[in-house]
């Protein structure tokens, strides 16, 4: 199977402008660029849970990436995509953001994302209820703390979250998630479902089946798929869908016959819709 670039080089590129209301009562114009790939949006690759795990292992074993390398690249791309979707000028509440982190790699991506958001001028806080003693995560936590990013001891009620934050980043579970949600994360997801500010999910909306989705679960406004979109992303009906993690080698793209868009310029992420 040909690569995205080779097979769809003749796709149509067009631009348009959207106008949205801001939280401050004004409006903001958004310049959007869309690549129409033979008018078949479905031609983009959506990988299964097993394929995602195999790709991850090949990045580690065959291409000698380390976990912290990929986590840094992924978390940075998340922060850039969020900054594009929710510019500082469009936010009230002093651009406050809550990043909810789980115990695994998705949570690590969230910690990296929080650090970069801070460097971009946002005011992130972190809710990290199940910490780990692994050095990688301890170091990521220290890096956030050294930037005076506050860590919440408990998750406030939905109304307080909605009043206190411009949006909430869901970095609880990634593509390795299976089975039932375990404590304390069931209560966390229940609370997040009741907030009125945007939920922004990293790679997989937490609580979703990685392939089948979850129509009754969290319904984020924003999703950034990492490496390649997972099958559940086909069920995503939110406003912003990005692809990030610009580190997939051509050999993996060819081996898994991935149809992925070409990142523009030096961008670490690309908007899919």
From Swiss-Prot:
Locate the YjeF N-terminal domain: which residues? 52-260
Q: Where does (6S)-NADPHX bind?
A: 105-109, 174-180, 203
Asked whether the keyword Cytoplasm is assigned, the reply is no
Domain of life here?
Eukaryota
Annotated EC: 5.1.99.6
- Does NAD count among this protein's keywords? yes
Kindly list the GO molecular function terms attached to this UniProt entry: metal ion binding; NAD(P)HX epimerase activity; nucleotide binding
Pfam families to which the protein is assigned, alphabetical = YjeF_N
Sorted alphabetically, which Gene3D superfamilies does this protein's record hold?
YjeF N-terminal domain
> Cofactor note, please?
Binds 1 potassium ion per subunit.
Name the cofactor(s) required for activity, per the record.
Answer: K(+)
Cellular component (GO) terms are: mitochondrion
Q: Which UniProt keywords are present, listed alphabetically?
A: Isomerase, Metal-binding, NAD, NADP, Nucleotide-binding, Potassium
**Catalytic reaction annotation:** (6R)-NADHX = (6S)-NADHX; (6R)-NADPHX = (6S)-NADPHX
Sites binding K(+) sit at: 106, 170, 206
Q: Which HAMAP family match?
A: NADHX_epimerase
Protein function: Catalyzes the epimerization of the S- and R-forms of NAD(P)HX, a damaged form of NAD(P)H that is a result of enzymatic or heat-dependent hydration. This is a prerequisite for the S-specific NAD(P)H-hydrate dehydratase to allow the repair of both epimers of NAD(P)HX.
Entry similarity comment: Belongs to the NnrE/AIBP family.
- Know the name of this protein? NAD(P)H-hydrate epimerase
């Amino acid at each position: 199977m040909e690569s995205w670039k080779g097979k769809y080089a003749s796709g149509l590129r067009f631009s348009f402008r959207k106008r949205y209301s801001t939280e401050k009562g004004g409006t903001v114009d958004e310049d959007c660029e869309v690549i129409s790939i033979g008018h078949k949006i479905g031609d983009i690759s959506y990988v299964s849970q097993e394929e995602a795990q195999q790709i991850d292992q090949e990045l580690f074993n065959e291409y000698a990436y380390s976990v912290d390398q990929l986590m840094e690249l992924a978390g940075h791309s998340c922060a850039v995509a969020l900054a594009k979707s929710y510019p500082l000028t469009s936010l009230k509440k002093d651009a406050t953001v809550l990043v909810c982190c789980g115990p695994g790699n998705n949570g690590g991506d969230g910690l990296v994302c929080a650090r970069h958001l801070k460097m971009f001028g946002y005011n992130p806080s972190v809710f990290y209820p199940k910490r780990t003693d692994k050095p990688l995560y301890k170091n990521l936590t220290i890096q956030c703390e050294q930037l005076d990013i506050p860590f919440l001891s408990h998750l406030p009620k939905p109304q307080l979250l909605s009043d206190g934050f411009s949006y909430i980043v869901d970095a609880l579970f990634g593509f390795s998630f299976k089975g039932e949600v375990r404590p304390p994360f069931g209560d966390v997801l229940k609370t997040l479902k009741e907030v009125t500010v945007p939920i922004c999910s990293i790679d997989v909306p937490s609580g979703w089946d990685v392939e089948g989705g979850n129509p009754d679960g969290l319904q984020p406004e924003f999703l950034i798929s990492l490496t390649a979109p997972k099958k559940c992303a086909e069920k995503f009906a939110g406003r912003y869908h990005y692809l990030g993690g610009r580190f997939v080698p051509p050999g993996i793209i060819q081996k898994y016959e991935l149809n992925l868009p070409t990142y523009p310029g030096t961008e670490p992420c690309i908007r899919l819709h």
